[in-house]
Amino acid sequence: MKLTTRLAIVAALAMALPARPQEQPSQPGSQNAQSLDPAVTQKMAQGVLESMSAEHMHMNAHLKWTEARPQSAEAFRRAEEIVKVLRESIEKYKDYQAALADGFKIFLPHIPQPMYHFTNYRYGLEAETKFDPARPTSLLYKKTPDGYELIGAMYTATRFTTEDDLDKRVPLSVARWHAHVNICLPPRGQGQTPDLTRYGPTGSISTEDDCTAAGGRFLGQIFGWMVHIYPFEQTPEKVFAH
């Protein structure tokens, strides 16, 4: 699939959601991202992944969360069924070689990460229009001395999906979907030198005004909604941890 910017290619891999070419022009400044050095885009993508690890999944200016909804027996029943289907469908991927054989691809396998995303891009495309709990976009693994340990999965939806529709996929009273927002890309021409403590998905700049003042290019939201589920955990709090 053709993507319009190098950043989109790297970040789409990181986000486990293939970006549509027609969506890119709607992102302010996205076409100027072509000038970013590949090493910079890789570092920024790694920052996104690190921000999605369990220990970093908290409120900050670069993460937007769905509003929690009132709990109900029906929502909890639905959530339990999703977890059951997911657990059964990914059990075989405890052998990570089976995941690779079925088309899941590891993002940045040679760079240390708290959690690795094995992504099936066909499933990601399917998730743009429908939800199948047995076909998560990404599998989540921790690195071990002899391979990878399966710990969970990630579902995705487009950035245009409403909270009502997200709730129909995975109840918002039980889980909270998140999106990566308020990203300031470094100014053009900085090569490998931009200060990534200021720019990118973990940088201190998080408003369009501040980004413009710094000479950067502001993206209101990159890619779609995501939710992590850890179906092998023993309590609902850990199964839907964020």
Positions of PLM-derived features:
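Bacterial N-terminal signal peptides
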Residues: A8-A16
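Boundary at the C-terminal end of the N-terminal hydrophobic targeting segment
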Residues: A19-E23
